[in-house]
């Protein structure tokens, strides 16, 4: 049962305010002794022409109390104490009935959300920074899907630019074909780094790189064939990484896809009198909005990122008619997106207000900077490998006889990394600390996965369980607190999508695991003479198991059945 909606319906019978407005005002009190839900009466003062305290007292006497243990007024607040047995029955029955679909809603029915995320550069390896956008975007994709939206996952590949001219030059000079077939990204990175090292000694190499890119732009068959090969080899490697992470996309249209779509954008901006010349470049002036000019064409007539993003935004609106278009790109790009969205708005596209930049912080790891050019990168492959190896060491120490321990180590190791990226507000930087990340205690991925495995173990050991349950028996503080947390799943998903902040759901999953462990540490489940209580508590364990599973799924993390 949706208690917020039920309370809103009851209050609506006595006040002139619409249901949605009432529901938004309903709060969950900080302390359980203050009730399970609270309604502040301040906003009703003008409508009812009474003091909030008096309104709370009047409503307390007037409202139907069915389904509630009691309703109290405390100052300007109306506090609702739900009937614990009814609340537990409604919550647990819904979770067990819905199963994997628990948490689904139709909030987004008929609306499309575009989410752009990951967007690695062709011919360059995945480093630890790439996982930030990938993890956030994948989680947002899944959460919006859960709310009934049509979601389009976009991987805006970095597959165009002057660097490809340099790469063609490097390929012609230094490539090792055998190495390229065996480990394409490694070999492409090696020759790319070598190009820059050699160009520092011989600057004419830069001219050669520009010449090859010009050939690529003008459709030279040999240059195009090499570019396509670099792209195909890179995509094959990217797919391997995405398979490990469990990430999928609906579109791989990268920067090159928009090459033939930019003239329309430039002409529209010209026709609307927005383009002006500045130092030889074509720009849109944004002085009135406290922003530097948005460069659309460079002095030599070449396009830049902004041109492509303008073309991409227009293409996506035309193709998907999105309700919201989300760009999961690092916070340093905030100004760039403000400029792009403002230019779209000035061009008369009101839907520019539906475009949102979702920024995120930096990944700090042993004080190393992530510079692809110099090859000094902390590779994602290395991070995953180390995480899985360290997890396997823990398993070999604590449970060496565990079945499929390599597969379990992979799920825990990968899950631990993803969880770390999503645990705190996305704007915060991440500092890796293996001891914390892989701990089975505290606010970590392994702790939540362990809680799931613990619940699964209880259920697997249960035998000859009564079919009769009595939810009024779940009367302890630990039991009721757990039920309340489980009932809050939908609200947390909505809060996370509203704020575009997966950490809200991550914190929620931690709360479920903590509440479950508090309950289990305080109360026996299987070792009971009361068969009805045993069956009822088992239903609570099954519900906890289901919600942890569904929550981790939305974060892009697998559960582990045994540990």
Swiss-Prot record:
A motif ('HIGH' region) lies at residues 120-130. It is found in: Cytoplasm. It comes from the Bacteria. Its EC number is 6.1.1.19. Keywords: Aminoacyl-tRNA synthetase, ATP-binding, Cytoplasm, Ligase, Nucleotide-binding, Protein biosynthesis. It is an enzyme of class 6 (ligase). GO terms for molecular function: arginine-tRNA ligase activity; ATP binding. Its main location: cytoplasm. GO terms for biological process: arginyl-tRNA aminoacylation. One of its GO terms (cellular component) is cytoplasm. Pfam families: Arg_tRNA_synt_N (PF03485), DALR_1 (PF05746), tRNA-synt_1d (PF00750). It catalyses: tRNA(Arg) + L-arginine + ATP = L-arginyl-tRNA(Arg) + AMP + diphosphate. InterPro entries: aa-tRNA-synth_I_CS, Arg-tRNA-ligase, Arg-tRNA-synth_N, Arg-tRNA-synth_N_sf, ArgRS_core, DALR_anticod-bd, Rossmann-like_a/b/a_fold, tRNAsynth_Ia_anticodon-bd. Monomer. Belongs to the class-I aminoacyl-tRNA synthetase family. HAMAP family: Arg_tRNA_synth (MF_00123). This is Arginine--tRNA ligase. The gene is argS.
